[in-house]
């Protein structure tokens, strides 16, 4: 869950395998918000498998994702109003700012004259419907491409480990326990991009956690050949995110794998 999720997994392709999915990634989404997004989904849906893209594990304690108002807004404003959202606000938002997330009109009162039907309809959807309605069920369908010139393949198999922020491990533990309680299978995935030293080394550390908890981690950084990724055409921005072409390759592989191993 993060922009890596909404750039990598296309629910329409999963539909072709009779797998009904929803992509709940948000920009720079940190693991604390991710936990509450998963909790919210499990509260209202009967979910068999939770696929967690692990890039959110690599944010450090002082990264902007933990303190940015923009990240808070994109993570919380699209959550339906519920006990889980209230818990998320109390846990993730500084106390002096919480009122504006409990009552959004407090935050936006100065622009009340600009409110129109779309504003109220959006509030209705987020507050009263189980899921906020989005085109492509949360996936971002970007077709632009920028050539990726770095040789990622040569370093993807490094076995070096790097410490992961303990707060992220805490929420990964909570996600694991929540899925166990709800009877949902947790599967970890690392998208093929980005793929550089720090990400590879921290993915190895998360892989150790997964092995200790008997959880599968599919590391697509090491499956670039299987996916037949083309770094001239499959990256949106020169090596950080996939575009529609690259996401199609990942989605087809993951959907086929899930279908064969968990839904036959």
Language-model features: where?
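Acidic-and-aromatic substrate-binding clefts and catalytic sites of carbohydrate-active enzymes
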Residues: 28-32, 162-168, 194-202
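Active-site-proximal beta-strand/loop segments in catalytic clefts of secreted hydrolases
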Residues: 1-3, 24-27, 53-55, 189-193, ...
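Membrane-embedded segments
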Residues: 4-87
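Loop/turn elements at helix/coil->beta-strand transitions in domains of secreted/extracellular proteins
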Residues: 17-20, 46-49, 180-187, 213-216
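Alpha-helical scaffolding within the catalytic cores
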Residues: 36-39, 169-175, 201-204
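Acidic/histidine-rich helix-loop elements
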Residues: 21-28, 160-164, 239
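Secreted/periplasmic serine-hydrolase-like ester/acetyl group-modifying domain
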Residues: 68-182
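C-terminal regions of proteins
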Residues: 200-264
